[in-house]
From Swiss-Prot:
Mg(2+) binds at residues 100, 102, 387. One of its GO terms (molecular function) is metal ion binding. This is 5'-nucleotidase domain-containing protein 3. Belongs to the 5'(3')-deoxyribonucleotidase family. Its cofactor is Mg(2+). GO terms for cellular component: cytosol; mitochondrion; receptor complex. Its EC number is 3.1.3.-. The gene is Nt5dc3. Substrate binds at residues 249-257. Coiled coil: none annotated.
Length: 546
C-alpha cells in the first residue's frame, strides 16, 4: 500500500522539484530567499515558444520518467501476509493475547453472507409485511464495502473520507448512483457536518442521522437496505426511510438473536468455517511460548464451543486462561455493574458469585473492570485482536492502554490488486500528472488552459479507473480519490497493528518489533521517506534549452 504511494509521490515531488525555477532557470538546489517567495512558480518558457508544444513536451517527458520507474516498483511489492504498524510495538512486551471470535479466530466462507441476506429478507416479508416481490433480490457480494455511511433520513449509502467529505460517484440510492449535482444540493456541498455523522460507535443515535457500517456482518445489511430501497423506488411506493432502516436493522439482528445463523452454521460447519488450520497453528505457537490467552466474544457458548472444537479440537479450552461469551461488547468495556456468570458443561447458567476466573471454564457477560480486577492483566502487556474497530478496539486503546490488533480480511485482496503492474502504472502516472498540473497551473493563457483541461480530464478518468480496480461502486476500503477513508482514519487511531488474518502472526517470531513506516508529511521532503532507493525518480529535465 505504502510502496506505490511513496514511489508515486516521490516521482511527483521530484518532477515538481525539477520543474521549479527562478527567472527561467531550473531550481535544482535550495532556492534563495528571494526566489523562495515565489511558491507557485513554474519554468518560464522562452517568449517564442509555442505553449501548447512546450506543455506537451513536459507531459511526454514525465510519462517517460514514469514508465522507467515502474519496473523498480515491481521489484519491491508488498507482502499480502505482512503485518502493518500504526504504532511501534514489540511482541517481547506482550505477555497476554486476547481474541474476539467471529472473523478473528474463525473465518467464514462466502456462503454466510448469502445466508444472512436471505434470512433477513424473508423476515422482512414474513414478520414486517414487506412486499413478497423483494424475494427476487439476491445477495451480491460485489456491491458494498465496509466503512460506508448510510444517511437514515435520506436513504442513501455513501463513502466518506477522513475529513468528512463525500466521495462523489459513491453515493447510492437503492442500487443506482446519485448524480453529483443532486448530492451537492442535498448536502449543500460535499461536506458532512460533525453533528450529522454517526456517534462514537458508528451508530445513528442522539441526533446523529448517519450509521457507519464497520463490521463484516454489515455487508449483507447494506445490500439488503439498498435492494429494498430499489424496489420501492422502481415501483413508486411511498415509504418512510427511517422505518425501512429500522426494519432492516431489526431483521438482521433477529438472524443473530433468534439463532438462525448459529443453527445453520452448526448444522453444516464445514460449509461455513474456513482456515481452521491457520488459527490452530497460531494458538499452538503462542501456547508453546508460554503466552496467556483469553477469548471475549458476543457469540453464545454452544456456538463458540462447536466452532472451536472444529478448529482446535475438543480440548480447546485448555489453551485459554479465560473464556467469556455473550459479552455484549462494547458495553462490556464500559459497564461496571454486570457480574460474570459461570456456564456449566450443559450450558446452564449458575448463580455462584465469581471470585476467580478459572481456566477451562466458560463465563457469560461480566465487564472489563471486574475482568481486570480478577486477572490483573493491565496495560501494554496485553494485546487484543478483533475485526470491529469500534466494538473490539476503541475503548481498549483509549481507556485501558491495551495494545490492539485489527483483523482486516479485505487487506489481502487489496494488496494483491495493488501489486499488479496495471495498478502500479496507473497510480504512478496519476501522481506524476497531478504534480504537473500543480506546477503548470501558473500558465493562464488560453492555449495553456486548454492543455491543462485535457490533463484534468485524463486525471479524472484515471481516478475513476483506480476506484474500479477494487469495487465498481465504492472503490477501496482504505482510500477515496485522494484522501484516506473515514474507516482508515479510525483504524489508524484505534489499532496499533493490522493484518489480513491472525495467520500473519506465523511470519514473525514472538520477539519481533513492529515499526510504523515513516512517510513524509505534506510539508516534509519526500527524501525523508524510508522508501527503498529504487523509488527515487530522476529529476525531470528542462523540456526546452535556452
Amino acid at each position: 500500500m505504502a510502496t506505490v504511494a511513496a514511489a508515486a509521490r516521490g516521482a511527483g515531488a521530484r518532477a515538481a522539484a525539477g520543474l521549479r525555477s527562478c527567472g527561467g532557470a531550473v531550481a535544482r538546489e535550495r532556492p534563495r530567499s528571494g526566489c523562495a517567495r515565489r511558491l507557485c512558480s513554474a519554468p518560464a518558457a522562452p517568449a517564442a515558444v509555442d505553449m501548447k508544444s512546450y506543455l506537451w513536451a513536459r507531459y511526454h517527458e514525465a510519462k517517460r520518467s514514469t514508465d522507467e520507474l515502474v519496473p523498480s516498483i515491481m521489484n519491491n511489492l508488498l507482502n499480502p501476509d505482512a503485518i502493518f504498524s500504526n504504532n511501534e510495538m514489540s511482541l517481547s512486551d506482550i505477555e497476554i493475547y486476547g481474541f474476539d471470535y467471529d472473523y478473528t479466530l474463525v473465518f467464514y466462507s462466502k456462503h454466510l453472507h448469502t445466508l444472512i441476506f436471505n434470512a433477513a429478507r424473508d423476515l422482512l416479508i414474513n414478520e414486517h409485511r414487506y412486499p413478497v416481490e423483494i424475494r427476487k433480490y439476491e445477495y451480491d457480494p460485489s456491491f458494498a464495502i465496509r466503512g460506508l455511511h448510510y444517511d437514515v433520513q435520506r436513504a442513501v449509502l455513501m463513502k466518506i473520507d477522513a475529513f468528512h467529505y463525500i466521495q462523489m460517484g459513491t453515493v447510492y440510492r437503492g442500487l443506482s448512483v446519485v448524480p453529483d449535482e443532486e448530492v451537492i444540493d442535498m448536502y449543500e456541498g460535499s461536506h458532512v457536518p460533525l453533528e450529522q455523522m454517526s456517534d462514537f460507535y458508528g451508530k445513528s443515535s442522539h441526533g446523529n442521522t448517519m450509521k457507519q457500517f464497520m463490521d463484516i456482518f454489515s455487508l449483507p445489511e447494506m445490500t439488503l437496505l439498498s435492494c429494498v430501497n430499489e424496489h420501492f423506488l422502481k415501483n413508486n411506493i411511498d415509504y418512510e426511510p427511517v422505518h425501512l432502516y429500522k426494519d432492516v436493522k431489526d431483521s438482521i439482528r433477529d438472524v443473530h438473536i433468534k439463532g438462525i445463523m448459529y443453527r445453520a452454521i452448526e448444522a453444516d460447519i464445514e460449509k461455513y468455517i474456513c482456515y481452521a488450520d491457520q488459527t490452530r497453528a497460531v494458538l499452538a505457537k503462542l501456547a508453546a511460548h508460554g503466552k496467556k490467552m483469553f477469548l471475549i466474544t458476543n457469540s453464545p457458548s454452544s456456538f463458540v464451543d462447536k466452532g472451536m472444537r472444529y478448529i482446535v479440537g475438543k480440548d480447546w479450552r485448555d489453551l485459554f486462561d479465560v473464556v467469556i461469551v455473550q459479552a455484549e461488547k462494547p458495553n462490556f468495556f464500559n459497564d461496571k455493574r454486570r457480574p460474570f456468570r459461570k456456564v456449566n458443561e450443559k450450558g446452564v447458567l449458575l448463580w455462584d458469585k465469581i471470585h476467580k476466573l478459572q481456566k477451562g471454564q466458560i463465563y457469560k457477560q461480566g465487564n472489563l473492570y471486574e475482568f481486570l480486577k480478577l486477572t490483573g492483566w493491565r496495560g501494554s502487556k496485553v494485546l487484543y485482536f478483533g475485526d470491529h474497530i469500534y466494538s473490539d478496539l476503541a475503548d481498549l486503546t483509549l481507556k485501558h492502554g491495551w495494545r490492539t490488533g485489527a483483523i482486516i480480511p479485505e487487506l489481502r485482496s487489496e494488496l494483491r490488486i495493488m501489486n499488479t503492474e496495471q495498478y502500479i502504472q496507473t497510480m504512478t502516472w496519476l501522481q506524476t500528472l497531478t504534480g504537473l498540473l500543480e506546477q503548470m497551473q501558473v500558465h493562464r493563457d488560453a492555449e495553456s488552459q486548454l492543455v491543462l483541461q485535457e490533463w484534468k480530464k485524463e486525471r479524472k478518468e484515471m481516478r475513476e479507473m483506480t476506484k474500479s480496480f477494487f469495487n465498481a461502486q465504492f472503490g477501496s476500503l482504505f482510500r477515496t480519490d485522494q484522501n484516506p477513508t473515514y474507516f482508515l482514519r479510525r483504524l489508524s487511531r484505534f489499532a496499533d497493528i493490522y493484518m489480513a488474518s491472525l495467520s500473519c502472526l506465523l511470519n514473525y517470531d514472538v520477539h519481533h518489533t513492529f515499526y510504523p513506516r515513516r512517510t513524509p508529511l505534506q510539508h516534509e521532503l519526500p527524501a525523508w521517506s524510508d522508501s527503498p532507493s529504487a523509488f527515487k525518480a530522476p529529476l525531470l529535465q528542462e523540456a526546452q534549452a535556452k
